[in-house]
Amino acid sequence: MDNYEYTELLKNLSKKMSNITGVVEPDKLYKRVAQIDELENSQDFWNDSSNAALVQKDKTQCERKLKKYNLAKNAIDDAKELYEMAKEENDEDLIAECFNGAQHIEDLIRTMEIEVLLSEETDGNNAILSIHPGAGGTESQDWASILLRMYKRFAERRGWSVEVLDYQAGDEAGIKDVSLLISGENAYGYLKVENGIHRLVRISPFDSNAKRHTSFSSVMVSPEVDDDINIVIEDRDIRVDTYRSSGAGGQHVNKTESAIRITHIATGVVVQCQNDRSQHKNRATAMKMLKSRLYELELENQKAEIAGIAKSEIGWGHQIRSYVMQPYQQIKDTRSNIAYSNVSAILDGDIDKMIEDVLISQNRS
């Protein structure tokens, strides 16, 4: 990097920061935090515990956004000041220090850009993520288990928690079906871009002839619905089936039919839960999963109407990403149209940049 490149970088980042300021409106956030502080000092505020919890959640989100905003703004302001001083004093070491810190500033601005993009109502919610292997038996079921590990590692890297709601092991390897509750900051905002069909091309470890196989798995992501979102589901709208639950690989086979499968008749949406030995608790969790799925479907319908897309095109049936292991190694996302060569790292959960590239490309379009 030379002086010209660094000067242009600072100009570009300053412009981005100015745009971010216009969207974030930090002054309004500070005022909102001050208002909530006043409310919290009122004894009446705590009488309604559910409302108090919602207001405090709002305060936490405002404070989190302000913290990230200030980190980015201070970084760019400090960099400009330090660079001007280095040029005035013709300090080559200080100029080199500025150049070395460029990537850190870019990362902070990018983090803030993503924060701005994750501003929809449910982006801050926890996520319910389900993986379903396509046709292809053991090969597809193994691919589903690879995706499961990728998402669990991704959540782990971000400090999010993962709860298995439903798990059905494959006959020989892999999984037939799995649903997770992933809890963490902006979990749904990030994971919503994973909705769709994931395609794998590799030489199958299950083929003695070592032939290349193509496998598919669908990923469905819904926001965990808060109690303040009212979704009414009547008993006549659903069909409830019970079955015996089993853990991963068949452990802890339950002799009673505690596992629950709920089918929403009108939409055909199916959810199931077997993470608890109590049928009552599994039903409650399955109903929550169903509400989340229906809410996600309604959000997609609304977006489609605005964009003029036919409802028949909505859903989780579009291929979004290809993972090629042979004859070369590459992962390509169809939304961002970006290819990645760090296949092993991505399958080990390093999917942050890939997700963020999709968010940015969707915003531009």
UniProtKB/Swiss-Prot annotation:
Report the GO molecular function annotations.
translation release factor activity, codon specific
- Give a yes or no for keyword Metal-binding in this entry: no
Can you say where in the cell this protein is located? Answer: Cytoplasm
Q: What is its main location?
A: cytoplasm
Where N5-methylglutamine occurs, the residues are: Q251
Q: Keywords, A to Z?
A: Cytoplasm, Methylation, Protein biosynthesis
Q: Name one Pfam family in it.
A: RF-1
Q: Which InterPro entries did the record assign? A: PCRF (IPR005139), Pep_chain_release_fac_I (IPR000352), Pep_chain_release_fac_I_sf (IPR045853), PrfB (IPR004374)
What's a GO cellular component annotated to this UniProt protein?
cytoplasm
Instruction: Output the PTM entry.
Output: Methylated by PrmC. Methylation increases the termination efficiency of RF2.
- Name the job this protein performs: Peptide chain release factor 2 directs the termination of translation in response to the peptide chain termination codons UGA and UAA.
Protein family according to the UniProt entry: Belongs to the prokaryotic/mitochondrial release factor family.
Q: What is this protein called?
A: Peptide chain release factor 2
